[in-house]
Regions:
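Active-site-proximal beta-strand elements of phosphoester/diester hydrolases
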Residues: 84-97, 225-235, 280
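Active-site environment of divalent metal-dependent phosphoester hydrolases
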Residues: 96-99, 132-135, 163-175, 236-239, ...
């Protein structure tokens, strides 16, 4: 304590303490007011985007209602004649749901609605990162509210849709974990007679890794013509729970065993004939990175092992964010001869 402070009278000391309390009170009050304003702005923005969804026109669907098989965690879509199933693949919608992402969320809603309106798909498959609960970019930790916004969007568009999780859907600091969000989707899905009656979703078997491993089969004239395997590529490795080091997880061995058993189960149902399939998940296989780096090193031209068949790479310097651990899925795909495409 300084000499001047020692010489203060008791009344002066009380006045000083009172002054400090007043200043502290003003600071705390100002912080509370700022937080209140941000919460209010976030709520207003969220409601504004929800109203935008309510004003959209339904696109609708012309396929028969799919049938859910709870025992095998699978849906079956039936078509007939020369009818083909049109699938729209989306990923990384990144709905923030907070005061920092109001405009971006609106753009995401408009982009999805425009794509669905133009393509008029029979089925939309979303491969993760629907929610983006990163607080310094979204302004919230509430990942359920973000998922619910997308669910309301797809319900309004009135098309069948399915999803898997990405690394951002359930961050370690989010309010709700993976199983809780999976339960929310499942309880609102077609399987449970939920309010999103065109959502095809299942948490999948309890005894394997992940919270959304399930199958969508397509039948035509009593034969299976296509299967879609929806798989959870999980989020981050155990030593990087916050994803700071970009140490991504992968498709685990027991999930690959499940995939193989599903390919063989559907083959048996199809009279012993292998059914063509596609796989949908979020985090790419390491083979994606190997192929992309080889293609890029060759001046973005085909090599003996890599052929760029279709599409446009808009970000030539973008790296493939995959796990450092190799999943056995790619080898299983080659061995079984069913899957013709993998989409992330």
């Amino acid at each position: 304590m300084g000499k001047a402070a020692k010489n203060l009278t008791e009344g002066q000391k009380k006045a000083r303490r009172k002054g400090k309390l007043i200043v502290t009170g003003w600071i705390v009050g100002a912080i509370v007011v700022v937080i209140g304003i941000l919460v209010a702005v976030g709520a207003i923005g969220y409601n504004g985007n929800m109203n935008k969804i309510k004003n959209l026109e339904a696109v609708g669907s012309t396929i028969e209602t799919p049938v859910y098989d709870a025992e095998n965690n699978s849906y079956t879509i039936t078509i007939s004649g020369d009818r083909e199933l049109k699938v729209l693949h989306l990923t990384d919608i990144h709905i923030g749901g907070g005061f920092l992402s109001i405009s971006k969320d609106g753009w995401a809603i408009e982009a999805v609605a425009t794509l669905v309106e133009r393509v008029k798909p029979d089925l939309v498959i979303v491969t993760g990162d629907i929610a983006y609960p990163v607080p310094f970019q979204a302004g919230t930790f509430n990942n359920k509210r973000e998922a619910q916004m997308f669910g309301e969007l797809m319900d309004k568009l009135d098309v069948y849709w399915a999803l898997t999780f990405g690394n951002h859907d359930t961050e370690s600091y989010s309010y709700f974990d993976r199983d809780e969000i999976a339960k929310m989707y499942y309880e609102n899905s077609l399987a449970c007679g939920g309010k999103w009656d065109k959502l095809l979703f299942s948490p999948g078997p309890d005894d394997i890794y992940g919270s959304c491993n399930y199958t969508i089969n397509v039948k035509n004239d009593n034969s299976y013509v296509q299967s879609f395997f929806i798989m959870d590529s999980n989020a981050y490795m155990g030593d990087d729970p916050f994803g700071i080091m970009w140490n991504y997880d992968r498709i685990h061995d027991d999930q690959v065993e499940w995939y193989e058993s599903e390919v063989n189960r559907i083959k048996a149902l199809n009279g012993g004939n292998v059914v063509k399939s596609m796989i949908f998940f979020h985090i790419p296989l390491t083979q994606y990175r190997d192929a992309w780096e080889e293609f890029r090193a060759n001046g973005y031209k085909n090599t003996a092992d890599v052929t760029y068949d279709y599409g446009f790479a808009g970000e030539g310097d973008e790296k493939v964010c995959c796990s450092e651990e190799v999943s056995p899925l790619f080898d299983a795909v080659l061995r079984l001869g069913s899957t013709k495409g993998i989409f992330c």
